[in-house]
């Protein structure tokens, strides 16, 4: 891997992440690498300015934080095919990150320069708000997301999109219609709907009763949030599916589209949200020689396997 330009992105508000970021900058600059350091958080999004800079795209983005910091980087960098190397510094579960200890030892950058790593491609989703009339939708049911969005940027997600009722004063339910490849599947009344990737299957979707999917599988998980019908269950659909979610009921109700937990768009009555697999993948640098997704699950979720694997062998 070439390392002419590297972005070092650290979690805002984390002293440990900032300290590690400074160490990375010093080590890379000692190797003659040009480095740009920036913080990322709920109120700090460095990527629009970084992408607009004259320096151009980096060869690598080093992300120091938790999964949320990685998700923010992936939403902006996947479309540019920028690889992401992430470490869990100041984060929580860290399904997407390497352990912090792999930052130590001074051999990390040489490994990258010698191509001693793997590149994992993670499926992403993209979405657009459809503001057309019912007649226009009927005439062009498969209009591209770019056509629907016009000059607005598409919404991207590595984990999930979800739609929930939007009100400032109360917490109402909503009724959402799900259409898959032109066929109405169900009406979900409850707190909303989650559309997740296999990567996002261990996040909000799992907390809502959805299944866990191996990231080597390309599929889309549809998980209702607290549905008011016992027959409303999560479903898994093929990755090439086109999903359209519309708001039913009172014409004063609005729903909010969220992307990986970040604000996306507000859907007014009559509008729909169209979601499908993104053309680009998130490129994740993997350092482990023999990575095991199941070992990660047992460790992060404290399954019995993590206890059994740590037991001493019988003599």
Curated annotation (Swiss-Prot):
GO cellular component: cytoplasm
Cell compartments where the protein resides: Cytoplasm
EC number(s) reported in the record: 2.7.1.23
Keywords assigned by UniProt, alphabetized: ATP-binding, Cytoplasm, Kinase, NAD, NADP, Nucleotide-binding, Transferase
Coiled-coil annotated residue ranges, if any: none
MF GO annotations: ATP binding; metal ion binding; NAD binding; NAD+ kinase activity
Cysteines engaged in disulfide bonds, as pairs: none
Sites where the protein binds NAD(+): 67-68, 159-160, 189, 191
InterPro entries in alphabetical order: ATP-NAD_kinase_N, ATP-NAD_kinase_PpnK-typ_C, NAD/diacylglycerol_kinase_sf, NADK
Principal place of residence: cytoplasm
GO BP annotation list: NAD metabolic process; NADP biosynthetic process
The reaction(s) this protein catalyses: NAD(+) + ATP = ADP + NADP(+) + H(+)
Gene3D superfamilies, per the entry: Probable inorganic polyphosphate/atp-NAD kinase, domain 1, Probable inorganic polyphosphate/atp-NAD kinase, domain 2
Entry annotated with the keyword Cytoplasm: yes
Pfam family, one: NAD_kinase_C
Cofactor: a divalent metal cation
First-level EC class: transferase
Active-site annotation: 67 (proton acceptor)
Family to which the UniProt record says this protein belongs: Belongs to the NAD kinase family.
Listed NCBIfam families: PRK02645.1
HAMAP family, sorted: NAD_kinase
Role played: Involved in the regulation of the intracellular balance of NAD and NADP, and is a key enzyme in the biosynthesis of NADP. Catalyzes specifically the phosphorylation on 2'-hydroxyl of the adenosine moiety of NAD to yield NADP.
Protein name: NAD kinase 1
Lineage: Bacteria, Bacillati, Cyanobacteriota, Cyanophyceae, Synechococcales
């Amino acid at each position: 891997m070439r390392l002419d330009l590297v972005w070092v992105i650290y979690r805002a508000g984390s002293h440990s992440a900032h300290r590690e970021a400074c160490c990375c900058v010093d080590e890379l600059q000692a190797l003659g690498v040009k480095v740009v350091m920036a913080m990322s958080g709920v109120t700090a999004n460095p990527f629009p300015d970084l992408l607009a800079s004259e320096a151009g795209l980096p060869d690598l983005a080093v992300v120091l934080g938790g999964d949320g910091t990685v998700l923010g980087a992936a939403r902006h960098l996947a479309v540019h095919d920028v690889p992401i190397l992430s470490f869990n510094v100041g984060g929580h579960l860290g399904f997407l990150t390497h352990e912090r200890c792999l930052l130590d030892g001074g051999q990390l950058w040489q490994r990258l320069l010698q191509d001693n790593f793997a590149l994992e491609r993670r499926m992403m989703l993209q979405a657009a708000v459809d503001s057309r009339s019912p007649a226009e939708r009927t005439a062009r049911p498969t209009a591209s997301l770019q056509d629907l969005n016009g000059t607005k940027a598409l919404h991207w997600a590595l984990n999930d999109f979800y739609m929930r009722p939007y009100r400032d004063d109360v917490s109402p339910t909503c009724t959402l219609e799900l259409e898959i490849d032109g066929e109405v599947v169900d009406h979900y009344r409850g707190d909303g709907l989650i559309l997740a990737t296999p990567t996002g299957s261990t996040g909000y979707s799992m907390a809502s009763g959805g299944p866990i999917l191996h990231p080597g599988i390309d599929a889309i998980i549809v998980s209702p949030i607290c549905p008011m019908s016992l027959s409303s269950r999560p479903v898994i659909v093929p990755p090439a599916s086109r999903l359209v979610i519309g708001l039913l009921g009172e014409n004063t109700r609005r729903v909010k589209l969220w992307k990986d937990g970040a604000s996306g768009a507000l859907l007014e009555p009559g509008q729909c949200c169209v979601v499908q697999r993104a053309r680009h993948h998130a490129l994740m640098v993997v350092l482990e020689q023999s990575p095991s997704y199941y070992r990660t699950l047992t460790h992060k979720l404290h399954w019995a396997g993590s206890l059994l694997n740590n037991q001493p062998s019988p003599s």
